[in-house]
C-alpha cells in the first residue's frame, strides 16, 4: 500500500515537472477577451512590450551590445508611453505611474527570462517556437506603428 502511494506521488511529480507551464501567455491571447477601449489592458500590453525589450537587451548584451542598447531604448519608450496612459486614466501622478511601470517591466522581464530559458532547453532558442516570438512580432508592430514617430 505504501509502495503504491509513493509510486503515485513520484508519478505525479514526474508529470508535473515535464508539463511545466509558462509564466505568461501571449499578449494576443491576453487581449483576446478584452474590450479595445480597456485602458488597463492597453497599458499592460505596453508594459509587457517594455519587459520583453528588457529581456532581449539582457540576452543580447554580450553578443550584440548595439542591439542590446537599442532594446533598452525601446523598453524605455514603451514604459514612458504606458506611464503616460496610466497617469491619465488612473489620475495618478506621472512619477507614481512611471515608478509602477518600471517595476512592472522589470518583473515581466524576469518572467520572460524564465520562459526563455525553458524554451532554450527545448529548442535551442530563447524565443522561437514560443509565445515570446508572437509577443516580439506584436511589440515590433506596436513600436513601428505607435511608439516610434
Language model segments and positions:
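Processing junctions and N-termini across compartments
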Residues: 15, 43-44, 133
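Compact alpha-helical subdomains of small soluble proteins
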Residues: 74-149
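Buried hydrophobic residues that stabilize the cores of well-folded domains
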Residues: 26-27
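Bacterial N-terminal signal peptides
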Residues: 7-16
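Bacterial N-terminal signal peptides that target proteins for export
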Residues: 1-7
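Short, charged/polar, low-complexity loop and linker segments
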Residues: 30-31
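Short N-proximal segments of mature Sec-exported proteins
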Residues: 35-91
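Sec/Tat signal peptide C-region and signal peptidase I cleavage site
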Residues: 17-22
Amino acid at each position: 500500500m505504501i509502495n503504491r502511494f509513493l509510486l503515485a506521488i513520484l508519478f505525479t511529480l514526474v508529470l508535473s515537472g515535464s508539463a511545466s507551464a509558462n509564466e505568461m501567455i501571449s499578449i494576443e491571447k491576453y487581449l483576446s477577451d478584452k474590450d479595445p477601449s480597456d485602458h488597463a489592458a492597453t497599458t499592460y500590453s505596453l508594459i509587457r512590450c517594455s519587459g520583453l525589450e528588457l529581456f532581449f537587451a539582457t540576452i543580447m548584451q554580450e553578443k550584440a551590445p548595439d542591439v542590446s542598447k537599442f532594446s533598452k531604448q525601446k523598453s524605455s519608450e514603451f514604459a514612458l508611453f504606458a506611464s503616460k496612459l496610466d497617469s491619465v486614466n488612473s489620475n495618478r501622478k506621472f512619477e507614481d505611474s512611471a515608478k509602477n511601470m518600471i517595476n512592472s517591466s522589470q518583473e515581466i522581464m524576469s518572467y520572460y527570462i524564465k520562459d526563455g530559458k525553458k524554451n532554450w532547453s527545448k529548442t535551442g532558442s530563447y524565443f522561437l517556437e514560443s509565445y515570446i516570438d508572437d509577443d516580439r512580432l506584436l511589440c515590433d508592430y506596436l513600436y513601428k506603428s505607435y511608439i516610434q514617430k
